[in-house]
Design a protein with these regions (language model features):
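A conserved beta-turn-beta hairpin within the catalytic core of GNAT-like acetyltransferases
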Residues: 65-77, 87, 109, 182-187
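Conserved acetyl-CoA-binding loop-helix of GNAT-fold acetyltransferases
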Residues: 87-103, 122, 203, 210
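Conserved GNAT acetyl-CoA-binding A-motif
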Residues: 103-116
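Glycine-rich, histidine-containing beta strand-loop boundary motifs that form or position
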Residues: 114-117, 138-140
Length: 250
């Protein structure tokens, strides 16, 4: 049985540091150091581990932030990783739900994180399983990294906004269907994107450029991603006007 719990000791947090190399293949230079995990746990952030019979098989870490304008406190979930052999076991969802539960216990209603728009499995999970929307997009957020999963591409990122106590999120987490405003625009990513990134870097870069250009255009017009459709051929981001979405807190 998988156990999710907060990490408290330096030794446990060192395990999370080691998992970064196993999961993403980061160099020592790019690892988030243990001292940041310790600091996050002490200044209002979150550090959770997922354990299978006492062995850490996943983790997540969030840091506190202030949203402007309005000085609204929120959490930025900077990192979540699960070992490859556990990625279809629901561990990522368990970690996110524990983050949500703990945040709501402190009356924090907003969590954000970033994800690669080409990672269509993650997109489906974030938008359709958790209920996050995408109101912002950032070009080359982290620069070029050494991760084997990034294939040398720029780190263009969707910004996921998860309004933890919204009707949308509660409906989706309960297995229901939220209100679906009319689609205004869409962006498709081919389902074979993982093979393309591994075998045809030039084509992968062209796809990324097209996707990023379209994201920047749509978001500049006040649109946000509120749904994600999957077919055998592609994953498709569905945009609606931001003011029409039922994602605000109750």
């Amino acid at each position: 049985m998988i156990e999710i719990r907060a990490l408290h000791t330096v030794e446990e947090m060192n395990e999370a540091v080691c998992l970064q190399q196993l999961i993403w293949g980061f160099t020592d230079y790019e690892l988030i150091p243990v001292r940041l995990f310790v600091t996050a746990s002490k200044v209002g952030g979150q550090v959770f581990g997922a354990f299978d019979q006492g062995r850490m098989i996943g983790f997540c870490m969030a840091i506190p932030g202030i949203k402007q304008p309005g000085n609204r406190s929120y959490l930025h979930s900077h990192m979540l990783g699960v070992m490859k052999e556990y990625r279809d076991a629901g561990v990522g969802r368990m970690l996110k739900l524990e983050q949500r539960k703990e945040a709501l216990s402190r009356s924090l209603g907003l969590m954000e994180w970033t994800f690669d728009p080409l990672e269509i499995k993650n997109a489906y999970f974030n938008i359709e399983r958790l209920g996050a929307i995408v109101p912002r997009y950032v070009l080359n957020q982290y620069g070029t990294t050494s991760s084997k999963l990034h294939y040398g591409l720029p780190t263009d990122r969707c910004v996921a906004a998860w309004l933890l106590d919204s009707a949308r999120v509660e409906t989706i987490l309960a297995g229901g269907q939220p209100e679906r405003p009319a689609s205004v625009a869409s962006i498709s990513v081919p389902s074979e994107i993982y093979e393309i990134k591994a075998n045809d870097p030039a084509r992968a870069r062209d796809i990324q450029q097209r996707v990023s250009d379209q994201f920047m255009e749509h978001i500049s017009k006040g649109l946000a991603v509120t749904a994600f459709h999957r077919t055998p051929e592609a994953g498709t981001y569905i945009f609606t006007a931001l003011h029409t979405t039922s994602w605000d807190s109750k």
